[in-house]
Amino acid sequence: MDKSDSLLQSSSKGLRSSIFFQGSSRILTFFLNQLTIRLTSPSAYAFSSIHFEILQSTILFLSRESVRLAMQRIPSENAIITSTSTESNKSKKLSDQLQLIKNTSLISVYIGIVISLLVSLFYFYSLPNFPYSKTCIFIYTVSSFIELLSEPYYEVLQWRQKFSKTASAEGLGTIICSLLSFAISVLGRNKAPSSLPFALGNLSEKVTIFFTLRYFAKQPFSIFLHKVGENERYIFWDSSTLRIICSHTYQVLLKHLITKGDKIMVAWYASPSAQGPYALASNYGSLLARIVFRPVEDHSHIVFAQLTHYKNKKDEKKALNLLAWILKLYSYMSLFILFGSNYSDIVLLFGAGSKWASPDSSSILSWYAMYIPFMAANGVLEAFYVSAANSSQLYDQGKCYLASAVFYFITGKFLLSWFNLGSHGLILANILNLSLRICFALRFILHNYKDFSLPRSLPRPFLLALSILLSIISSFLVKHWRESKVPFLVYFLSAPSLAILYSCFIILVDKDVRGYAKILLSKYYIK
């Protein structure tokens, strides 16, 4: 078995573990969060899911994303073992590479100190007054920095291809967070509404992740650099890795503005009454993204970077086949969403409760569901682009990010203020923005990789037509249920019935899906 097949197998094992832990933990925490939301006011939930989520993601993303992207191109532990002949050289090379990885990951910690101070100070002076708001800002800042301190352990496990370990740590942290948030919400249900339960839950999550990753990595804790000897000279970092980090920094900043642009605009332009329903829709609508799309994107970054780094035709073909396989599955998930988005009323009624189940919240959730396929496709396409592109092409991507960021904020403000579309306008602006980025990434792939076949990644025309027909049927049912012309039980049971019917047609019509299912159940082997 060659190195690329070994990488695909270890990655597929990690991906299955990641999806399992993300799925099980997210489903468990989903139900706990619904109980917590029922005890929380819309304004308190909006502060937690929008304002404080922006604070934390800004600290984490700007501090570590460019470092993570650069380190995905570093040869794995297994690659070094198989490529080094003598035992003495192997031991020395592994030891040096391990220390370089820990040194490089500490860059995230050092950058995080500065960014944490700047972002927290900005929030202290700009955030609207709310019960325990200053305390929550401090807690979210501290919890973000604790997660940054776990970066050396995370990167060591990634280098060793122990992907299931990182997935376990994140899953356990999520469960602890939900349990503590719910417990504090129950204890403080008679007090003034605040985001404090979510803040303390978030802190417990990051502490859990830190100690779990440290246990799995089995490395001593240190925030100091250690020299590494190389060719009779000593270094702290590999110069080529530093160049890649610098080349990613500009794109990371722009990508963060684009990715969190909707929440930034909701936080600063939308009314407090509109922030709660949008935060809830974002929570529900991105559940599938957090369970499936995020683990797939994270592992795709690693696999694509390793398979395209050495410009080997055989490995490149495996990467392209894997990309086509993922896009194919995403396309069918998107067609499920096409008719499944009409059942948002059921999700709100059984999830957040009747006080959240307004027509406006249901409409926002349906629109957000239509946005998810664009988010999924863009994630895996950009993962391939970032992994395969050279420095000049990464600079071109930065220009694309800048153009799409300007386009997004202008379009969002235009739809939000001039057309008074509110949250619907922001979702539409997001879809238009991601469409531009998808076209940019596809252009790069089609131009540089002639073996990639886009039609192979698309659903069969018959299945697309069937999804549209099922969408019309589900729209008819929800309309007549709201008018009390159809019993709730009929409307409720139609959801799983249509999903099962559509699944059967996919298996019958598309023979590729049957082959992909076998791959998913056994192991990744890309012919």
Curated annotation (Swiss-Prot):
Keywords assigned by UniProt, alphabetized: Endoplasmic reticulum, Membrane, Sugar transport, Transmembrane, Transmembrane helix, Transport
GO-annotated biological processes: dolichol-linked oligosaccharide biosynthetic process; glycolipid translocation; protein N-linked glycosylation
Membrane topology listed for this record: Multi-pass membrane protein
GO terms under cellular component: endoplasmic reticulum; endoplasmic reticulum membrane
Subcellular location field: Endoplasmic reticulum membrane
InterPro entries in UniProt: RFT1
GO molecular function, one term: glycolipid floppase activity
Primary site of residence: endoplasmic reticulum
Pathway: Protein modification; protein glycosylation
Keyword RNA-binding annotated: no
Keyword NAD in record: no
Segments crossing the lipid bilayer: 42-62, 106-126, 137-157, 167-187, 319-339, 364-384, 402-422, 426-446, 461-481, 488-508
PANTHER family documented for this protein: ENDOPLASMIC RETICULUM MULTISPAN TRANSMEMBRANE PROTEIN-RELATED, PROTEIN RFT1 HOMOLOG
The family this protein is said to belong to: Belongs to the RFT1 family.
Function in brief: Intramembrane glycolipid transporter that operates in the biosynthetic pathway of dolichol-linked oligosaccharides, the glycan precursors employed in protein asparagine (N)-glycosylation. The sequential addition of sugars to dolichol pyrophosphate produces dolichol-linked oligosaccharides containing fourteen sugars, including two GlcNAcs, nine mannoses and three glucoses. Once assembled, the oligosaccharide is transferred from the lipid to nascent proteins by oligosaccharyltransferases.
Protein name as it appears in the record: Man(5)GlcNAc(2)-PP-dolichol translocation protein RFT1
Source organism of this protein record: Schizosaccharomyces pombe (strain 972 / ATCC 24843)
